[in-house]
């Protein structure tokens, strides 16, 4: 099983490799990837250094080209494919059908993965991507249960990648319109959920307020940790009560499901967080490396260590974790 870790910078990439990542995924410094924030991601020169470092240590580098090409501007996405291949990436993670077609026809030897943004949630969809574009792996959305993941593993021979830890999204990735509704821009087109140019913070007599395109998303009291203002994780007044009406900030943590993921034949476990710091990458990579190694050394004796959970909780969104949709009773 591959441990796939995020990097939004060269220091984060080196940290991931040094702490046991089998592969690292990154993006270019533009809107062709779904973590397009100021100060994040890689220029070609930085990416060249990243490739060298990863390959010197016997690991792999995946490049996310996982937004959808704008009308009349698809050349930029095709060029991203060209650059990724030329710079020596081991795999390209792509969502857009036309970009997949371009990559598969121009670079048939390149390993292609279907991005979570493509929202492939059934065996027929996965077979389509395999037959049309010869994809080797599909990244599954975080809304599937373990029962559904197992079902897909039985019905396809395409490698499956699942999110194992990190920020949790309650939407089927690739299908969310909340950011578009609020700002006119979506992660699928500009590469950012709640684009930074629409974010504003303001100290008021009532507390620290976070706004997205002038709409109040949350208000924080003294000493309360403030989160990045995403619409789905805001607190809103409903019937006279103020609470997280859509989703409470929390992180996915599937350490307890590791035996099931192994037995299901999941090819790769993915850590979310290209927008997070090298310190986050270090902590999470180290814990997950230890857990995977412990299971492989003695599957029968595998147990989640309390210190693993404690270390992950410290870097979790909202300082709490959940199994998310993986453990839901309804299918």
Question: What role is predicted for each listed range?
Answer:
Residues 1-120, 139, 143, 147-268, ...:
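Active-site pocket-lining/capping segments in soluble small-molecule metabolic enzymes
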């Amino acid at each position: 099983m591959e441990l796939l870790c995020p990097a939004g910078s060269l220091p984060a990439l080196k940290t991931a490799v040094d702490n046991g990542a089998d592969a690292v995924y990154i993006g270019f410094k533009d809107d062709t990837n779904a973590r397009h924030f100021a100060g994040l991601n890689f220029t070609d020169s930085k990416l060249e250094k990243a490739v060298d470092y990863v390959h010197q240590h016997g690991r792999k580098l995946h490049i996310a080209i996982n937004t959808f090409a704008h009308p009349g501007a698809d050349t930029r996405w095709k060029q991203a494919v060209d650059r990724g291949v030329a710079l020596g990436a081991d795999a390209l993670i792509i969502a857009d059908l036309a970009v997949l077609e371009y990559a598969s026809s121009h670079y048939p030897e390149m390993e292609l993965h279907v991005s979570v943004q493509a929202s492939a949630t059934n065996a027929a969809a996965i077979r389509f991507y395999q037959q049309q574009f010869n994809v080797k792996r599909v990244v599954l959305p975080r809304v599937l249960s373990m029962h559904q993941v197992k079902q897909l593993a039985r019905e396809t021979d395409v490698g499956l990648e699942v999110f194992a830890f990190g920020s949790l999204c309650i939407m089927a990735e690739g299908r969310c319109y909340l950011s578009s509704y609020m700002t006119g821009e979506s992660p699928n087109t500009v590469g950012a959920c709640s684009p930074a140019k629409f974010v504003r913070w303001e100290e008021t007599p009532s507390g620290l307020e976070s706004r997205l395109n002038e709409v109040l998303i949350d208000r924080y009291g003294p000493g309360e940790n403030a989160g990045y203002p995403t619409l789905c994780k805001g607190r809103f007044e409903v019937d006279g009560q103020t609470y997280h009406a859509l989703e409470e900030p929390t992180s996915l943590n599937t350490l307890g499901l590791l035996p099931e993921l192994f037995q299901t034949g999941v090819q790769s476990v993915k850590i979310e967080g290209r927008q997070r710091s090298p310190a986050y990458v270090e902590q999470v990579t180290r814990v997950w490396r230890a857990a995977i190694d412990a299971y492989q050394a003695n599957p029968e004796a595998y147990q989640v260590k309390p210190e693993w959970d404690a270390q992950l909780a410290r870097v979790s969104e909202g300082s709490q974790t959940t199994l998310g949709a993986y453990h839901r009773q309804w299918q």
